[in-house]
């Protein structure tokens, strides 16, 4: 464990969260839409709207022992969206901090890679069996809709980063993103 500012967490969470290294992908189709997965949060997202529990996230997941971020990203894409032959682009962003919308709150250390698919055909039939939280569905988001959406998209700044990448401006160093709840 590292020295972290866990004091800002909701009162019902443990003060010392376990750390989880995670790899995720910004998955683009040929039309430059971004694939996201909708999950159901285990606790209210917005105290003013306790019924609002849906949030959108990129495909990806935790590293297995000895696994690199790149290898984990490829494995997760196979498990979650059925994509096995994929060219992984560069790591374009990082997001480190406490995340408490999943069943198992954690200090997440996430790395995000770019993936461009030749079509929008994905197989999500195994997605629900690999996830801690209920999966509500998947969606290919047009980037303008993603940027204008009032829905909870994690992490903050994802829509802007996706638009930047789609326009051809791929960061040469990973940018830092933050959780909506940070």
Task: Map each language-model feature to its residues.
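Short, charged/polar surface micro-motifs in flexible loops or helix N-caps
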Residues: 28-34, 42-43, 64, 94-98, ...
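A generic structural micro-feature
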Residues: 17-19, 50-55, 103-109, 130-135
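Active-site-adjacent beta-strand/loop module that shapes the phosphate/pyrophosphate-binding cleft
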Residues: 96-126, 139, 164
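Nudix hydrolase/Nudix homology domain
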Residues: 53-56, 119-123, 127-182
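N-terminal strand-loop-strand
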Residues: 2-58, 70
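The catalytic Nudix box helix
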Residues: 58-92
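Residues that scaffold the ATP/ADP-binding catalytic core of kinase and kinase-like folds
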Residues: 37, 66, 146-149
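A structural signal for short, well-ordered beta-strand segments
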Residues: 25, 91, 111-113
């Amino acid at each position: 464990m590292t020295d972290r500012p866990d004091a800002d967490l909701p009162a019902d969470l443990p003060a010392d969260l376990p750390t989880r290294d995670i790899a995720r992908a910004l998955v683009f189709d040929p039309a430059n839409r971004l694939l996201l997965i909708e999950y159901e949060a285990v606790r209210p997202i917005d105290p003013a709207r306790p019924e609002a529990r849906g949030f959108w996230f990129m495909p990806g997941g935790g590293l297995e022992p000895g696994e690199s971020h790149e290898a984990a990203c490829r494995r997760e894409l196979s498990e979650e969206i059925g994509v096995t032959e994929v060219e992984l682009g560069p790591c374009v962003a990082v997001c480190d901090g406490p995340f408490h919308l999943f069943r198992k709150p954690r200090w997440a250390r996430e790395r995000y890679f770019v993936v461009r698919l030749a079509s929008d055909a994905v197989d999500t039939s195994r997605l629900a069996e690999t996830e801690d939280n209920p999966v509500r569905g998947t969606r290919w988001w047009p980037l303008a809709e993603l940027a204008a959406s009032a829905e909870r998209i994690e992490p903050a700044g994802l829509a802007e980063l996706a638009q930047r990448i789609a326009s051809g401006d791929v960061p040469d160093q990973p940018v830092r993103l933050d959780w909506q709840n940070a």
